[in-house]
Amino acid sequence: KEFYDELNQETINLLWDDTNRLYTIKEQVAYPFKNEWVEYEAWLSSVSDNNINTNKSVNDFISVLFKDNNHPFNHRGQYYKITLDGEHEETYICYDKMNVLSQTSDFKVVRCNQTLRWVDKTNGDIIEMPCYIGYDLSSTNNQYAKDGAIPNARLIIYVQANEQTMNIEINQRFMFMHKQCYKVEQVEDYETDQFCDNPTMVKLYIAYSPLLAVDNAELNLCDYYS
């Protein structure tokens, strides 16, 4: 086993610079998650599998490969900072972590295309957390009604599990783009990660909610005046 592990690492070392997919990215220090970052070189490529479809932007999903096959295992919900165009640094969240049975240190991330903002009920502080919002297809088939075909899709949010997000409740509301509101219908915050006793990522199922008088569109906050 050690022989093949070394051979695999030597092959990667030999080919590492022979690509135009080489980037320097920042990995969040974990676990526990901290607002500290470590830079690593990585190969980046687009994810192409059955889960990426017309309801999702392919550009948002990235496969990451680190050079060191013994890179410390990461976690779902761990954040990464990536600058694809050389100018705009964006935050990504890991949704498919490294596999202990894999011969390489590779995993998948998705771009955080929104920010969760809400008011902490205990102290009134405004909390902000990068997140991904998109559609989770429950079936590959459409539902058919008299008005036409309806996709079996639900809006979901992926966000890191931490002290703040683990307190998100059903019926809690969030605003995006200073006008669009959604309420939480289901919270999945109980799945522990491999080699970690605590949940590392929260998955929220959300549904449309109208803008209410207690909301502050200017601050992009729901239930601000409640």
What are these regions (language model features)?
Residues 22-27, 70-84, 163-177:
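Short coil-to-beta transition motif at edge beta-strands of beta-rich domains
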Residues 42, 75-99, 173, 179-193:
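Short beta-strand-centered aromatic/proline hotspots
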Residues 140-187, 195-199:
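Intrinsically disordered, low-complexity segments enriched in Gly and acidic/Ser/Thr residues
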